[in-house]
């Protein structure tokens, strides 16, 4: 398998209004997490942190030049493996235990991490052979109705279980923008995880349909939909 240098592991795409997409282009699309950086006047938010194979802080030092809230949309390995790099870590109570004590089973890493996940490796062939998600206990628990105040913009927490019990989305009412986590994305439905619940999933989708959404920034597949 191809080897790529660590400084090529991430790609960043800057959108409008202080929103940036970070992703790992050498992770195959089905497994690739879209990480969203949202810039505010006083602090920033990073929604999810990817596979953890390469350090976000080392390769993208601008992420921590300002106060940063690292939010876990849920605690599957491909969304939280970089969370240990950040001082402020936010998660829903239903999955806080996984963030604090992750293993190959509760994060789904054992089921998915392998050759089929990658187009290339970051300077270490078979580096996933000893892959593990490092513990990153939540420093703040967030739930339905909580608000992340960035100074000049506000993100409201929506509890959207179904894909997992502690799944959350972030809603910016002022711009009608939804950061949907894995509850809405452009790709095949994957709802056979040990803690997925289709009834909860349907209920979450129904409540999201009531929002006046203009833009969805999803976590898998095509980054944004209008």
Q: Where are each of the predicted segments found?
A:
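Conserved beta-strand hairpin/beta-sheet module of binuclear metal-dependent hydrolase folds
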Residues: 8-62, 169-181, 185
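Active-site micro-motifs of SAM-dependent methyltransferase domains
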Residues: 21, 78, 96-97, 166, ...
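Active-site HxH/HxHxD metal-binding segment of metal-dependent hydrolases
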Residues: 51-148
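Hydrophobic/aromatic beta-strand patches that form the interior of the parallel beta-sheet core
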Residues: 20-22, 69-71, 90, 140-142, ...
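Basic/polar N-terminal segments that are highly enriched at the extreme N-terminus
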Residues: 1-8
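A general structural motif
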Residues: 42, 65-67, 213
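Short Pro/Gly-enriched beta-strand edge/turn motifs at strand-loop
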Residues: 16-23, 126-131, 151-153
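Metallo-beta-lactamase
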Residues: 44-46, 51-52, 133, 137-140, ...
């Amino acid at each position: 398998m191809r080897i790529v240098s660590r400084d090529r592991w991430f790609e960043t795409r800057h959108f409008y209004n202080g929103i940036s997409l970070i992703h790992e282009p050498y992770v195959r699309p089905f497994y690739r997490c879209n990480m969203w950086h949202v810039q505010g006047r006083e602090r920033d938010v990073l929604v999810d942190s990817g596979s953890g194979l390469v350090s976000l802080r080392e390769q993208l030092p601008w992420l921590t030049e300002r106060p940063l809230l690292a939010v876990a949309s849920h605690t599957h390995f491909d969304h939280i493996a970089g969370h240990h790099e950040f001082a402020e870590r936010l998660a829903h109570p239903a999955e806080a235990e996984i963030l604090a004590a992750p293993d190959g089973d509760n994060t789904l890493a054992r089921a998915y991490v392998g050759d089929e996940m990658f187009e290339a490796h970051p300077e270490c062939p078979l580096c996933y052979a000893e892959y593990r998600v490092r513990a990153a206990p939540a420093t703040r628990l967030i739930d339905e109705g909580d608000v992340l105040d960035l100074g000049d913009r506000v993100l409201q927490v929506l509890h959207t279980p179904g894909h997992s019990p502690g799944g959350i989305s972030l809603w910016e009412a002022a711009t009608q923008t939804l950061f949907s986590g894995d509850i809405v994305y452009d790709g095949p439905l994957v709802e056979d995880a040990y803690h997925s619940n289709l009834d909860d999933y349907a209920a979450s989708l129904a409540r999201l349909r009531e929002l006046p959404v203009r833009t969805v920034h999803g976590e898998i597949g095509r980054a944004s939909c209008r």
